[in-house]
Structures are given as C-alpha cells and as structure tokens.
C-alpha cells in the first residue's frame, strides 16, 4: 500500500528472455520479468515448473547455468556476478530447507553478515538490542542467538531464523522460496507478519508459495503462474483464488 502520496518506483530487477539449464536439461525457457521497488510478486506453479530454478539463477547458484538471456539488477547486468557479490549488493534468498552451520552462533552470523552487506561494523550493544527486538517479534527466545545456526532447530524455527536474517540484513530484493512449507497455522501467521514488516517502498519481494495463508497479511501486486519453464499467466491476487479452486490443470 503506497498511501495517497505518489511514490517514485525504481526498477530493482529486470529479467529478459532467461534460459536456464541444469545438467544440460533446459528448465527455464525464456522468462521475462520486471520488478520495481515497493512491489510484491508471487510465483506459483506445480512442482517442476521452474520456480526454484528461477530464484537460484537470480542468486547465481552454479548448478543452474544461464544459457541465454540477461538479468539486470538496479539497471546493471549481473550475469557475471558471483553469488557473494549479489548478496553483498542486497539480494537475499531463503531456502525450502535452510542449512545448519555447526560451530557458528546465530547472533555472530547475523552480525558478521550485516557488516559484510553494509560495509560498516555495527555496535555490538546496538546490534544486540535490535536483534532482540526482531527475535521478540518472531517469538524466538533470545537464547537462540547463542545457538549454532539451524543446528537442532525445528522446521518452524529454521524458517523464523531466515525471516530474522531478512529483517536484520534488510536487503533490496528478497526471494522467499516456500517459506511457509511445513509450518503450522500459528507459525505461518508469525512468518507472514515478519515479511509484512520488512516490505517497504524501497525494496521488492518475490515469494514462491502453494498456499494463500502466507499472504494473509501481504498484498501481492502481481501473481505469475509458471508451467514448463515459462510464465503463462500474470495477474493480480485473484489468480490465487483460481488456483485454489481449479488447481494447475487449467493453466
């Protein structure tokens, strides 16, 4: 919601004719997608349609080979950028199954990540105060900051941990891959509220989901339906109603 005042929108991401292959098998077959600041884009599609492949290609996962087309971030072609460079530039991706990092405390991990992204070393006292506030909003006990990243975390705790990373790092482009997967109703609401708190006129969000519950507090500006590596339909959030009613067979 932009309010009554006109907001100047900035192009965050522009994908042109993107083809992506995995092990020489073409998964994406000509994707065009433009995302501006302040926008929330939802990507839906049956399993194997190419949703996660798209996010991994944007994040420069080396398993996913861009064979044709271009990815522009803030007007700059990033085809040759490494994953690390994209992350430092403000591109964030959550995962369906977040990895555990034994030996690295969550609080230390977030403080170091924030330093790398911002280029500034945050005050420990100020950082810890802000971290506690964000953890409280996600109903995570502050003791989690001293636990190793995702080690022994339940599925719900791992997803909340990723939203904590999102809110702490405050990236320009957030890509959330089935963040609601495996969560109970209460956890979905907490995660949904966390995403809503992050959204602003200065950033943009791509959400992959099969369920509308995650979007309970989030207004989707565009919904895209993928099938066989192509975007076949783009519309408003009424497309989600159609999917819930008819499934993907009509696509």
Task: Describe the predicted segments one by one.
Residues 13-15, 28-30, 35:
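Conserved structural motif at the start of ABC-family nucleotide-binding domains
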Residues 25-28, 85, 189:
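Short coil-to-beta microelement around the adenine-binding A-loop and adjacent beta1/P-loop entry
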Residues 44-46:
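The feature captures the beta-strand-to-loop junction immediately N-terminal to the Walker
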Residues 59:
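Helix-to-loop junction immediately C-terminal to a conserved catalytic motif
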Residues 70-86, 150:
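ABC ATPase NBD Q-loop/coupling interface
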Residues 99-172:
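ABC-family P-loop ATPase nucleotide-binding domains
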Residues 178-179, 186:
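Walker B catalytic motif
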Residues 222, 226, 230-251:
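Conserved beta-strand-loop-alpha-helix hinge in the C-terminal portion
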């Amino acid at each position: 919601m932009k309010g009554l005042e006109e907001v100047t929108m900035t192009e965050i991401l522009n994908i042109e004719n993107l083809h992506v292959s995995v092990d020489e098998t073409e998964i994406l077959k000509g994707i065009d997608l433009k995302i501006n600041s302040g926008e929330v884009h939802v990507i839906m599609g049956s399993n194997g349609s190419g949703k996660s492949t798209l996010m991994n290609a944007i994040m420069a996962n080396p398993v996913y080979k861009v064979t044709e087309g271009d990815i522009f971030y803030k007007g700059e072609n990033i085809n040759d950028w490494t994953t690390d460079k994209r992350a430092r530039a403000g591109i964030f991706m959550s995962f369906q199954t977040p990895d555990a990092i034994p030996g690295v405390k969550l609080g230390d991990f977030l403080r170091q990540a924030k330093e790398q992204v911002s280029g500034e070393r945050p005050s420990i006292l100020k950082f810890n105060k802000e971290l506690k506030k964000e953890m409280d909003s996600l109903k995570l006990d502050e003791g989690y900051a001293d636990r190793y990243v995702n080690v022994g975390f339940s599925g719900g705790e791992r997803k909340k941990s990723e939203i904590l990373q999102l809110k702490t790092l405050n990236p320009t482009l957030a890509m959330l891959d089935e963040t609601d997967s495996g969560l109970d109703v209460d956890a979905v609401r907490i995660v949904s509220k966390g995403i809503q708190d992050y959204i602003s006129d200065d950033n943009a969000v791509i959400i992959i989901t099969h369920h509308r519950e995650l979007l309970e507090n989030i207004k989707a500006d565009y919904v895209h339906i993928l099938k066989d590596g192509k975007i076949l339909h783009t519309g408003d959030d009424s497309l989600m109603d159609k999917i819930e009613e008819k499934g993907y067979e009509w696509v």
